[in-house]
Amino acid sequence: MKNKGIDQFRVIAAMMVVAIHCLPLHYLWPEGDILITLTIFRVAVPFFFMISGYYVFAELAVANSYPSRQRVFNFIKKQLKVYLLATLMFLPLALYSQTIGFDLPVGTLVQVLLVNGILYHLWYFPALITGSLLLTSLLIHVSFKKVFWLAAGLYLIGLGGDSWFGLIQQTPIEPFYTAVFHLLDGTRNGIFFTPLFLCLGVLVRKQSEKRSLSKTALFFLISLIGLLIESAYLHGFSIPKHDSMYLFLPVVLFFLFPLILRWHPHRTWKHPGQLSLWLYLLHPYTIAGTHFLSQKISILQNNLINYLVVLILTIGFICLFLRQKHSWFRHKQTTPVKRAVKEFSKTALLHNLQEIQRIISPKTKVMAVVKADAYGCGAKEVAPVLEQAGIDFFAVATIDEGIRLRKNAVKSPILVLGYTSPKRIKELRRYSLTQSIISEGHAVALSQRKVAIDCHLAIDTGMHRLGVTPTIDSILSIFDLPFLTISGVYSHLGSADRLNPDSMIRTQKQIACFDQILLELDQRQISYGITHLQSSYGILNYPDLNYDYVRPGILLTGSLSDTNEPTKQRVSLQPILTLKAQLITKRVVAKGEAIGYGQTAVANQETTVGVVSIGYCDGLPRSLSNQEFCLSYRGQSLPQIGLICMDMLLIDLSHCPTIPIESEIEILTDWSDTAEQVQTITNELICRIGPRVSARIK
């Protein structure tokens, strides 16, 4: 969710930071340096903080879920790495300028590293990291509204240790600030300064669509005037300890940020994020260089010229570096050769999703079942594509499958359809997984753990595999259990894939049982959340049912379990998976020679044999051996010969012996026909693909 205005203003904000460190108007107009450089340009660092709040903390402020927490923790890790890199980068300059030394007391060194940084501009990183940790710990336990007002209170306290310090001197509260200075060296840090602007970023994200542009611009101008008056007063009638924190500064940012969001600049910097970061990081080295040169080049003693030279040199160096970096990566990037791949078609997946949505009720949504690694197609690849396409609920078979999805940044709710031991209940909560209650005993055991979790209640309507007894008293007893929030009710149809009379009678009984339970819950005004009953064949054979969700699995892969079984609703499906492997060698075999293991295949003439790097260990059925099973290369059919080995198979290349080594050979594209050939269902064939087969998005 990049925003061009935000990205381009990053560079402007970095230039403002450079100006603060160069004081360009110092000799030409000292008062202007105070009002412009040390006042207006102070929006720069809070702007960077607000970006973090806007993009990183907005989700955590709404819901304390694993994806939102993980996003924040990953962000903090990244900032720690940048801070470590910057510290190492500026260690020579810090030692040279005597900002730090080898004789520095341990306590002071700790304060420098945790609060100020080893050079004057590096305070930003510990402030951001500390503020992020503080805000995260608060949001996990307290509502955003309370956190916001706490952050605002901390900022007001911080004013007294910054620009308002001159006014609180010789007052009863001065000893408090003396203690703060002793511990933290000031209030421009991650405790008093950063949290409010992170919260403001979140607040703008929540309210961005509600604001009138003209009113926002008007309030921005009014608050900016207030900021200038405040600064003029504080600098004119007191001596601020620092001038980073003003009373009107948060107000200015609150109205400025939405204006930047709606800004659409015509001329833009390339790679603005990297440019602004490196401009912020590197400019002190350029300042040190121009300061040294100013002893011989007197014009550099003019602060404005010095500022412009610092900008030009730093930006020029960064642009050259980035250009060279991207050029180097372009030359270095090569597609790694894989012995075997399952190529996943995003286009086919989205087509299948649209076909499903076409036949279900407009009010019914899709809960994508991605168990068994998305039926062997690769959940890591499939789930993000579906989520981006609007799928807002996923289902898996086990807790570990759910955890893997979470670690691959899937944000939507995830339902665990199978059994999870109550001993793992903390993992359910940690990863924000919704657990199926599969029996009365399971419900009681989960509740006894005294850990609040989200659940869906599975009802055994007649399949007799998983689910609670379909009686209202049994179900109500589960609703009464503490710590279990039941946000959904579902069941599973055992014979929906057949349209013979017995199967249809059984299915109608299950539907009637499920509907009766829902009716009785409604009559008792029990809130049971969402409902779902149909899986893939339930969708095709009973499309007129109206529940909140359907649960397609094999349908999304573009296949049917059994193509010989007719369905009430026809759909146009596209297989999303193509199995490919490399041609790794080829050789000429004389007439009469046995090929491969045993003597099941003997060359009846001189034959060019190719070896392909895939075997039954990778999930290819060995029963396909010598069964007229054909591979293909650019439309050319390549018959499989001999017994399929564990890691390889052999093909007849007599009609196309010039295929280059390391060419990709198509092994399987029509999964349904191949499943029929080996007398199994498509589900099993796809799920057999082994872990050695790499996944790739087409």
From Swiss-Prot:
UniProt keyword list: Antibiotic resistance, Cell membrane, Cell shape, Cell wall biogenesis/degradation, Isomerase, Membrane, Peptidoglycan synthesis, Pyridoxal phosphate, Transmembrane, Transmembrane helix
Q: What InterPro entries does this protein's entry cite?
A: Acyl_transf_3_dom (IPR002656), Ala_racemase (IPR000821), Ala_racemase/Decarboxylase_C (IPR009006), Ala_racemase_C (IPR011079), Ala_racemase_N (IPR001608), Ala_racemase_pyridoxalP-BS (IPR020622), PLP-binding_barrel (IPR029066), Serine/alanine_racemase (IPR011248)
Active site annotated at which positions? K371 (proton acceptor), Y597 (proton acceptor)
- SUPFAM superfamilies (UniProt xref): Alanine racemase C-terminal domain-like (SSF50621), PLP-binding barrel (SSF51419)
Q: Gene Ontology cellular component?
A: cytosol; plasma membrane
Task: Please list every transmembrane segment annotated in the UniProt record, as residue ranges.
Answer: 11-31, 43-63, 82-102, 122-142, 148-168, 184-204, 217-237, 245-265, 275-295, 302-322
UniProt remark on domains? The cytoplasmic C-terminal domain is responsible for the racemase activity.
Q: What is this protein called?
A: Serine/alanine racemase
Q: Which organism is it from?
A: Enterococcus gallinarum
- Lineage of origin: Bacteria, Bacillati, Bacillota, Bacilli, Lactobacillales
